[in-house]
Protein backbone atom coordinates (compact mmCIF):
# COMPACT_ATOMS: atom_id res chain seq x y z
CA UNK A 1 0.00 0.00 0.00
CA UNK A 2 2.83 2.35 0.85
CA UNK A 3 4.64 1.61 -2.40
CA UNK A 4 1.56 2.42 -4.55
CA UNK A 5 0.99 5.91 -3.09
CA UNK A 6 3.31 8.86 -3.63
CA UNK A 7 5.08 10.11 -0.47
CA UNK A 8 6.19 13.55 0.57
CA UNK A 9 8.38 14.78 3.45
CA UNK A 10 7.29 17.92 5.26
CA UNK A 11 10.01 19.86 7.14
CA UNK A 12 10.35 22.70 9.62
CA UNK A 13 13.66 24.19 10.82
CA UNK A 14 14.83 23.84 14.43
CA UNK A 15 13.77 26.29 17.07
CA UNK A 16 10.26 25.50 18.33
CA UNK A 17 9.45 22.97 21.03
CA UNK A 18 6.61 21.14 19.26
CA UNK A 19 5.06 21.28 15.79
CA UNK A 20 1.88 19.64 14.53
CA UNK A 21 1.02 19.15 10.84
CA UNK A 22 -2.61 19.52 9.84
CA UNK A 23 -4.55 19.99 6.58
CA UNK A 24 -7.19 18.54 4.34
CA UNK A 25 -5.99 14.99 5.05
CA UNK A 26 -7.35 15.20 8.65
CA UNK A 27 -9.98 17.91 8.10
CA UNK A 28 -7.77 20.51 9.83
CA UNK A 29 -8.03 18.77 13.23
CA UNK A 30 -4.31 18.97 14.09
CA UNK A 31 -3.77 15.26 14.64
CA UNK A 32 -0.25 14.66 13.24
CA UNK A 33 2.73 15.84 15.37
CA UNK A 34 6.06 16.10 13.57
CA UNK A 35 9.17 14.17 14.66
CA UNK A 36 12.18 16.05 16.04
CA UNK A 37 15.53 14.79 14.76
CA UNK A 38 18.86 14.98 16.70
CA UNK A 39 19.73 18.31 15.06
CA UNK A 40 16.53 19.91 16.40
CA UNK A 41 14.68 20.16 13.08
CA UNK A 42 11.22 18.70 12.55
CA UNK A 43 10.08 16.49 9.68
CA UNK A 44 7.50 13.91 8.81
CA UNK A 45 6.81 11.77 5.73
CA UNK A 46 3.35 10.63 4.77
CA UNK A 47 1.52 9.46 1.64
CA UNK A 48 -0.35 12.06 -0.39
CA UNK A 49 -3.07 11.67 -3.00
CA UNK A 50 -4.26 13.92 -5.81
CA UNK A 51 -7.63 13.72 -7.51
CA UNK A 52 -6.24 15.21 -10.71
CA UNK A 53 -2.87 16.45 -11.95
CA UNK A 54 -4.00 20.01 -11.34
CA UNK A 55 -5.35 19.40 -7.81
CA UNK A 56 -3.60 20.75 -4.73
CA UNK A 57 -2.74 19.26 -1.32
CA UNK A 58 -3.38 21.92 1.37
CA UNK A 59 -1.66 21.87 4.78
CA UNK A 60 -0.49 24.12 7.60
CA UNK A 61 1.81 23.98 10.68
CA UNK A 62 0.83 24.52 14.31
CA UNK A 63 4.03 25.87 15.91
CA UNK A 64 3.90 25.89 19.74
CA UNK A 65 0.12 26.33 19.55
CA UNK A 66 0.08 28.94 16.76
CA UNK A 67 -1.20 28.23 13.25
CA UNK A 68 1.55 29.37 10.89
CA UNK A 69 2.34 28.77 7.20
CA UNK A 70 5.91 27.93 6.13
CA UNK A 71 7.92 30.10 3.77
CA UNK A 72 9.58 27.01 2.26
CA UNK A 73 6.32 25.97 0.57
CA UNK A 74 3.85 27.64 -1.72
CA UNK A 75 1.20 29.79 -0.04
CA UNK A 76 -2.44 30.13 -0.97
CA UNK A 77 -4.55 33.01 0.39
CA UNK A 78 -8.26 32.36 0.60
CA UNK A 79 -10.40 35.07 2.23
CA UNK A 80 -7.43 36.34 4.23
CA UNK A 81 -6.36 32.89 5.44
CA UNK A 82 -2.91 31.70 4.41
CA UNK A 83 -2.28 27.98 3.83
CA UNK A 84 0.58 26.00 2.29
CA UNK A 85 0.01 23.61 -0.58
CA UNK A 86 1.91 21.20 -2.82
CA UNK A 87 1.15 19.74 -6.24
CA UNK A 88 2.01 16.50 -7.97
CA UNK A 89 5.03 18.17 -9.56
CA UNK A 90 6.49 18.97 -6.10
CA UNK A 91 6.21 15.31 -5.15
CA UNK A 92 8.05 14.24 -8.31
CA UNK A 93 10.84 16.78 -7.77
CA UNK A 94 11.41 15.58 -4.21
CA UNK A 95 11.50 11.96 -5.39
CA UNK A 96 14.15 12.81 -8.01
CA UNK A 97 16.28 14.45 -5.32
CA UNK A 98 16.04 11.22 -3.30
CA UNK A 99 14.58 12.78 -0.20
CA UNK A 100 11.20 11.12 -0.32
CA UNK A 101 11.95 8.33 2.15
CA UNK A 102 9.08 7.32 4.35
CA UNK A 103 9.47 7.65 8.10
CA UNK A 104 7.80 4.51 9.60
CA UNK A 105 6.42 6.37 12.59
CA UNK A 106 4.73 9.01 10.45
CA UNK A 107 3.15 6.52 8.08
CA UNK A 108 1.71 4.51 10.91
CA UNK A 109 0.39 7.59 12.59
CA UNK A 110 -1.25 8.87 9.45
CA UNK A 111 -3.18 5.65 9.08
CA UNK A 112 -4.16 5.44 12.77
CA UNK A 113 -5.40 9.04 12.92
CA UNK A 114 -3.94 10.87 15.93
CA UNK A 115 -1.48 8.36 17.40
CA UNK A 116 1.11 10.46 19.31
CA UNK A 117 4.67 10.18 18.05
CA UNK A 118 6.16 11.08 21.45
CA UNK A 119 4.87 7.86 23.00
CA UNK A 120 8.18 5.98 22.53
CA UNK A 121 10.04 8.78 24.34
CA UNK A 122 7.57 8.66 27.21
CA UNK A 123 8.06 4.92 27.56
CA UNK A 124 11.81 5.39 27.51
CA UNK A 125 11.63 7.93 30.30
CA UNK A 126 9.39 5.67 32.36
CA UNK A 127 11.94 2.88 32.18
CA UNK A 128 14.72 5.10 33.51
CA UNK A 129 13.72 4.96 37.14
CA UNK A 130 16.10 5.74 39.95
CA UNK A 131 17.25 2.75 41.95
CA UNK A 132 18.32 2.76 45.57
CA UNK A 133 20.20 0.35 47.81
CA UNK A 134 19.23 0.19 51.48
CA UNK A 135 21.77 -0.83 54.11
CA UNK A 136 20.38 -1.68 57.53
CA UNK A 137 22.11 -2.56 60.81
CA UNK A 138 19.93 -4.72 63.06
CA UNK A 139 20.56 -4.75 66.84
CA UNK A 140 19.52 -7.90 68.73
CA UNK A 141 18.94 -8.00 72.49
CA UNK A 142 20.28 -11.32 73.85
CA UNK A 143 17.98 -11.26 76.90
CA UNK A 144 14.62 -10.63 75.23
CA UNK A 145 15.48 -11.62 71.65
CA UNK A 146 13.98 -8.37 70.39
CA UNK A 147 15.40 -7.01 67.13
CA UNK A 148 15.39 -3.35 66.16
CA UNK A 149 16.87 -1.27 63.34
CA UNK A 150 20.04 0.35 64.71
CA UNK A 151 20.86 2.39 61.57
CA UNK A 152 19.69 2.66 57.98
CA UNK A 153 21.54 4.03 54.97
CA UNK A 154 20.05 4.67 51.52
CA UNK A 155 22.44 4.73 48.55
CA UNK A 156 21.38 5.55 44.99
CA UNK A 157 22.58 2.99 42.45
CA UNK A 158 23.96 3.92 39.02
CA UNK A 159 21.95 3.08 35.90
CA UNK A 160 24.24 0.16 35.05
CA UNK A 161 23.55 -1.71 38.31
CA UNK A 162 20.38 -3.61 39.00
CA UNK A 163 18.83 -3.74 42.45
CA UNK A 164 17.79 -7.36 42.09
CA UNK A 165 21.36 -8.36 41.23
CA UNK A 166 22.65 -6.59 44.33
CA UNK A 167 20.17 -8.45 46.53
CA UNK A 168 21.21 -11.77 44.99
CA UNK A 169 24.85 -10.98 45.70
CA UNK A 170 24.28 -10.31 49.35
CA UNK A 171 21.94 -13.30 49.71
CA UNK A 172 18.80 -13.52 51.77
CA UNK A 173 18.55 -11.00 54.58
CA UNK A 174 18.11 -12.25 58.12
CA UNK A 175 15.28 -9.83 58.80
CA UNK A 176 13.42 -10.64 55.56
CA UNK A 177 13.79 -7.07 54.28
CA UNK A 178 15.27 -5.85 51.00
CA UNK A 179 18.78 -4.44 50.92
CA UNK A 180 21.90 -5.35 52.85
CA UNK A 181 21.44 -6.09 56.54
CA UNK A 182 24.11 -6.38 59.24
CA UNK A 183 23.24 -7.96 62.58
CA UNK A 184 25.07 -6.96 65.76
CA UNK A 185 24.65 -8.21 69.29
CA UNK A 186 23.52 -6.04 72.16
CA UNK A 187 26.58 -5.02 74.17
CA UNK A 188 24.52 -4.70 77.34
CA UNK A 189 23.58 -8.37 77.36
CA UNK A 190 27.17 -9.47 76.71
CA UNK A 191 28.53 -7.38 79.58
CA UNK A 192 25.95 -8.76 81.98
CA UNK A 193 26.85 -12.31 81.03
CA UNK A 194 30.56 -11.70 81.65
CA UNK A 195 29.85 -10.05 84.99
CA UNK A 196 27.74 -12.94 86.30
CA UNK A 197 30.08 -15.75 85.34
CA UNK A 198 33.03 -14.98 87.70
CA UNK A 199 30.60 -14.28 90.56
CA UNK A 200 29.11 -17.75 90.23
CA UNK A 201 32.56 -19.35 90.16
CA UNK A 202 33.67 -17.56 93.33
CA UNK A 203 30.36 -18.01 95.21
CA UNK A 204 28.85 -21.40 94.40
CA UNK A 205 26.99 -21.63 97.73
CA UNK A 206 25.09 -18.41 97.12
CA UNK A 207 23.93 -19.88 93.84
CA UNK A 208 22.51 -22.93 95.70
CA UNK A 209 20.55 -20.80 98.15
CA UNK A 210 19.19 -18.74 95.23
CA UNK A 211 17.82 -21.76 93.41
CA UNK A 212 16.16 -23.36 96.44
CA UNK A 213 14.88 -20.20 98.08
CA UNK A 214 16.02 -18.01 100.97
CA UNK A 215 15.81 -19.30 104.54
CA UNK A 216 14.76 -16.84 107.22
CA UNK A 217 15.05 -17.50 110.93
CA UNK A 218 12.85 -16.16 113.72
CA UNK A 219 14.73 -12.83 113.73
CA UNK A 220 14.03 -12.26 110.02
CA UNK A 221 17.66 -12.72 108.88
CA UNK A 222 18.79 -14.98 106.09
CA UNK A 223 20.66 -18.07 107.21
CA UNK A 224 23.68 -19.13 105.21
CA UNK A 225 24.36 -22.69 104.16
CA UNK A 226 27.60 -22.74 106.20
CA UNK A 227 25.72 -22.67 109.54
CA UNK A 228 23.93 -25.85 108.54
CA UNK A 229 27.22 -27.55 107.73
CA UNK A 230 28.61 -26.72 111.17
CA UNK A 231 25.54 -28.04 112.98
CA UNK A 232 25.49 -31.25 111.00
CA UNK A 233 29.10 -31.85 111.91
CA UNK A 234 28.24 -31.35 115.61
CA UNK A 235 25.48 -33.95 115.42
CA UNK A 236 27.85 -36.39 113.76
CA UNK A 237 30.30 -35.89 116.62
CA UNK A 238 27.60 -36.60 119.17
CA UNK A 239 26.65 -39.82 117.39
CA UNK A 240 30.27 -40.94 117.36
CA UNK A 241 30.63 -40.20 121.09
CA UNK A 242 27.44 -42.10 121.82
CA UNK A 243 28.74 -45.17 119.98
CA UNK A 244 32.01 -45.01 121.91
CA UNK A 245 30.14 -44.81 125.24
CA UNK A 246 28.01 -47.81 124.36
CA UNK A 247 31.15 -49.81 123.52
CA UNK A 248 32.72 -48.94 126.87
CA UNK A 249 29.54 -50.01 128.71
CA UNK A 250 29.08 -46.89 130.79
CA UNK A 251 32.19 -45.40 132.52
CA UNK A 252 32.67 -43.39 135.69
CA UNK A 253 30.78 -40.20 136.51
CA UNK A 254 33.90 -38.14 136.08
CA UNK A 255 34.42 -39.46 132.52
CA UNK A 256 30.77 -38.84 131.54
CA UNK A 257 30.88 -35.33 132.92
CA UNK A 258 34.06 -34.71 130.94
CA UNK A 259 32.40 -36.04 127.81
CA UNK A 260 29.41 -33.80 128.46
CA UNK A 261 31.65 -30.76 128.78
CA UNK A 262 33.55 -31.76 125.60
CA UNK A 263 30.37 -32.23 123.58
CA UNK A 264 29.04 -29.00 125.03
CA UNK A 265 32.15 -27.13 123.91
CA UNK A 266 31.94 -28.71 120.48
CA UNK A 267 28.32 -27.64 120.15
CA UNK A 268 29.14 -24.15 121.36
CA UNK A 269 31.71 -23.49 118.68
CA UNK A 270 29.55 -24.21 115.61
CA UNK A 271 26.52 -22.57 117.16
CA UNK A 272 28.46 -19.44 117.89
CA UNK A 273 29.74 -19.42 114.32
CA UNK A 274 26.23 -19.95 112.96
CA UNK A 275 25.01 -17.10 115.12
CA UNK A 276 27.68 -14.87 113.57
CA UNK A 277 26.47 -15.78 110.12
CA UNK A 278 22.85 -15.21 111.04
CA UNK A 279 23.12 -11.84 112.77
CA UNK A 280 26.63 -10.80 113.78
CA UNK A 281 25.69 -7.28 114.88
CA UNK A 282 23.21 -8.37 117.61
CA UNK A 283 23.88 -10.35 120.82
CA UNK A 284 20.78 -11.97 122.27
CA UNK A 285 20.68 -12.13 126.11
CA UNK A 286 20.45 -15.51 127.81
CA UNK A 287 17.25 -14.68 129.63
CA UNK A 288 15.39 -13.86 126.44
CA UNK A 289 16.60 -17.11 124.87
CA UNK A 290 15.33 -19.28 127.76
CA UNK A 291 11.92 -17.63 127.69
CA UNK A 292 11.72 -18.22 123.95
CA UNK A 293 12.52 -21.90 124.46
CA UNK A 294 9.73 -22.31 126.98
CA UNK A 295 7.13 -20.61 124.79
CA UNK A 296 7.74 -22.68 121.68
CA UNK A 297 5.69 -25.78 121.04
CA UNK A 298 8.60 -27.92 119.81
CA UNK A 299 8.87 -31.12 121.79
CA UNK A 300 12.67 -31.27 122.15
CA UNK A 301 12.76 -27.82 123.79
CA UNK A 302 10.09 -28.81 126.34
CA UNK A 303 12.02 -31.94 127.17
CA UNK A 304 15.09 -29.91 127.94
CA UNK A 305 13.10 -27.78 130.37
CA UNK A 306 11.70 -30.80 132.26
CA UNK A 307 15.08 -32.48 132.56
CA UNK A 308 16.70 -29.35 133.89
CA UNK A 309 13.94 -29.01 136.52
CA UNK A 310 14.48 -32.58 137.79
CA UNK A 311 18.19 -31.93 137.91
CA UNK A 312 17.63 -28.83 140.07
CA UNK A 313 15.35 -30.65 142.55
CA UNK A 314 17.76 -33.51 143.18
CA UNK A 315 21.00 -31.56 143.27
CA UNK A 316 21.12 -27.85 143.94
CA UNK A 317 24.80 -27.37 143.15
CA UNK A 318 24.90 -27.71 139.33
CA UNK A 319 22.28 -24.99 138.64
CA UNK A 320 24.66 -22.98 136.47
CA UNK A 321 25.31 -26.04 134.32
CA UNK A 322 21.58 -26.53 133.77
CA UNK A 323 21.16 -22.92 132.74
CA UNK A 324 24.12 -23.23 130.39
CA UNK A 325 22.68 -26.31 128.71
CA UNK A 326 19.26 -24.74 128.44
CA UNK A 327 20.74 -21.58 126.89
CA UNK A 328 22.70 -23.69 124.40
CA UNK A 329 19.59 -25.53 123.22
CA UNK A 330 17.53 -22.37 123.07
CA UNK A 331 19.98 -20.66 120.70
CA UNK A 332 18.78 -23.01 117.99
CA UNK A 333 15.92 -21.08 116.35
CA UNK A 334 12.60 -22.78 116.19
CA UNK A 335 10.92 -23.22 112.83
CA UNK A 336 8.61 -20.20 112.27
CA UNK A 337 5.06 -20.87 111.25
CA UNK A 338 4.22 -20.52 107.57
CA UNK A 339 7.80 -20.99 106.29
CA UNK A 340 8.49 -23.52 103.58
CA UNK A 341 10.87 -26.44 103.91
CA UNK A 342 14.36 -25.21 102.95
CA UNK A 343 17.91 -26.54 102.63
CA UNK A 344 18.59 -25.53 106.28
CA UNK A 345 16.03 -28.01 107.53
CA UNK A 346 18.67 -29.71 109.65
CA UNK A 347 18.89 -26.63 111.88
CA UNK A 348 15.56 -27.51 113.50
CA UNK A 349 16.63 -31.06 114.43
CA UNK A 350 17.50 -31.85 118.06
CA UNK A 351 19.99 -34.53 118.92
CA UNK A 352 17.93 -35.36 122.02
CA UNK A 353 15.62 -37.47 119.85
CA UNK A 354 18.45 -39.88 119.11
CA UNK A 355 19.45 -40.08 122.77
CA UNK A 356 22.73 -38.16 122.62
CA UNK A 357 23.99 -35.83 125.28
CA UNK A 358 20.78 -35.73 127.33
CA UNK A 359 20.71 -39.50 127.63
CA UNK A 360 24.06 -39.27 129.36
CA UNK A 361 22.71 -36.49 131.55
CA UNK A 362 19.80 -38.73 132.61
CA UNK A 363 22.29 -41.44 133.57
CA UNK A 364 24.14 -38.93 135.74
CA UNK A 365 20.93 -37.90 137.49
CA UNK A 366 20.18 -41.50 138.38
Swiss-Prot record:
Q: Where is the composition biased (Acidic residues)?
A: 233-247
Instruction: Give a GO biological-process term.
Output: signal transduction
Gene Ontology, cellular component aspect: cytoplasm; nucleotide-activated protein kinase complex; nucleus; plasma membrane
> What SUPFAM superfamilies does the record tag this protein with?
E set domains
Give the sites modified to Phosphoserine: 160, 288
**Taxonomy, superkingdom:** Eukaryota
Q: Where is this region: Disordered?
A: 159-180, 217-366
Where found, per UniProt?
Cell membrane
Enter cross-link residues for Glycyl lysine isopeptide (Lys-Gly) (interchain with G-Cter in ubiquitin).
314
Report how it sits in the membrane: Peripheral membrane protein
* Assigned keywords, A-Z: Cell membrane, Isopeptide bond, Membrane, Phosphoprotein, Ubl conjugation
Say yes or no: keyword Chloroplast present.
no
MF GO annotations? protein kinase binding
PANTHER family per record = 5'-AMP-ACTIVATED PROTEIN KINASE , BETA SUBUNIT, CRUCIFORM DNA-RECOGNIZING PROTEIN 1-RELATED
Q: What does this protein do?
A: Involved in G-protein mediated signal transduction and in the regulation of polarized cell growth in pheromone-induced cells.
Family recorded in the similarity comment: Belongs to the CRP1/MDG1 family.
Q: What is this protein called?
A: Signal transduction protein MDG1
Q: What is the lineage of its organism?
A: Eukaryota, Fungi, Dikarya, Ascomycota, Saccharomycotina
Tell me what gene encodes this: MDG1
Amino acid sequence: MQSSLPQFTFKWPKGPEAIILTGTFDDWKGTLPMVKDPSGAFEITLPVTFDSPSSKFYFKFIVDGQWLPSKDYKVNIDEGVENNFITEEDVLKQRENGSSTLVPESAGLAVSKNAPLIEPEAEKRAKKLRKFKIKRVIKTNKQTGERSIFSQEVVELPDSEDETQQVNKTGKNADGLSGTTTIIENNVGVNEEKAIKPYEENHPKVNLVKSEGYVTDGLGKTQSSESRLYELSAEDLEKEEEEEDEDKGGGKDTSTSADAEASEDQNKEPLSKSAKFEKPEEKVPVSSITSHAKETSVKPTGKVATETQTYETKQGAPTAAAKKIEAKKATRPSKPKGTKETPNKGVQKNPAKNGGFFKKLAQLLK
